[in-house]
Amino acid sequence: MFDPHILDSPAVIFDNGSGLCKAGLSGEIGPRHVVSSVVGHPKFKTPLTGANQKKYFVGEEALHRHEVLQLHYPIERGLITGWEDMEKLWKHLFEWELGVKANDQPVLMTEPSLNPRETREKMAEVMFESFNVPAFYLSDQAVLALYASACVTGLVVDSGDGVTCTVPIFEGYSLPHAVTKLYVAGRDITEHLTRLLLASGRTFSCVLDKALVDDIKEKLCYVALEPDKELCRRPEEVLREYKLPDGNIVPIGDQLYQAPEALFSPEKLGIQNPGLSKMVSCSITKCDADIQKTLYGEIVLSGGTTLFQGLDDRLLRELEQLASKGTPIKITAPPDRWFSTWIGASIVTSLSSFKQMWVTSADFKEFGTSVIQRRCF
């Protein structure tokens, strides 16, 4: 029997990303736990440990043991592809990170724009049937990021680890026909930076593994306002120093702006798709002429890959050339944008009016998985 009072409990919020899963409780200012979206399974069974051997490891624990584990990434390019591992990840978040019982509190999960119907229904099925949650809701990541900026109409530029997308939103609803996606994001920029550093001829006293290159990227990379002019600058003007884990200092130059350039020029990675600025312009052009000006005036950045210094200035400069002459353009770059989707979810689930939005276990029992299509949009 469904108890309506359970909807008064703070909701559990999972923001599922290709690189990171963010978990926490409704009404809080940020996620309590941020875990790498990875599950590791032992490569070998060791007879000595026997029954005590863990069957799998999650997040950072898996990454630290990567030599003896087979690593699985259950979310690829924003979409869940490994369901068994995803369940393990959610179980870990409920029990070990948050320390809550899944059947005690409602659960809101975020989803990418254009999430396939079968994926949405499977998420609901797993939550209700495997975890016995009392109530569930699916919410678009871009819409939530816009809510975090106190807006209901605007265009969200969201770039995380696996996918970059531009999502126009009108009065709280995304406009699916105008969403554009680019499969160049944080992971690709890290890989590109690795290749550029190796090709630079510099010697590194440490192995350039993903964690190290991620750190270089996050600390030193930037988006050039005019990449052609950047190329003409004297080497000493662009050189930055990076301290390796062994204490050695290595100078790094042009690679620091060349790697993120792939967001604006995907052809650098052999991908024949429009770059970020053209994506925004294309998304807005596909919308009703009446709201195009409003969308240009409320562009919001979201996701960790939009944190590069100079990205907002470059985007603004290029959009001024693409938009109709005299169109006012405003780009908002919230400082906490790497988890603005989670913040938006925390805000929306705290509203008393949200209670009527939940899909309850009773609804699921009565209507089955299709209830998600009707109620979560």
Swiss-Prot record:
Could you tell me which SUPFAM superfamilies the record lists for this protein?
A: Actin-like ATPase domain
An example Pfam family from this entry, by short name, is Actin
Q: Where in the cell is it found?
A: Cytoplasm, Cytoskeleton
Q: Which family does it belong to?
A: Belongs to the actin family.
* UniProt-listed InterPro entries: Actin (IPR004000), ATPase_NBD (IPR043129)
Q: Mind listing the UniProt keywords for this protein, alphabetically?
A: Cytoplasm, Cytoskeleton
Coarsely, its chief localization is: cytoplasm
* Organism the protein comes from: Bos taurus (Bovine)
Specify the domain of life of the species encoding this protein: Eukaryota
Task: Tell me the protein's name.
Answer: Actin-related protein T2
User: A GO CC term?
Assistant: actin cytoskeleton
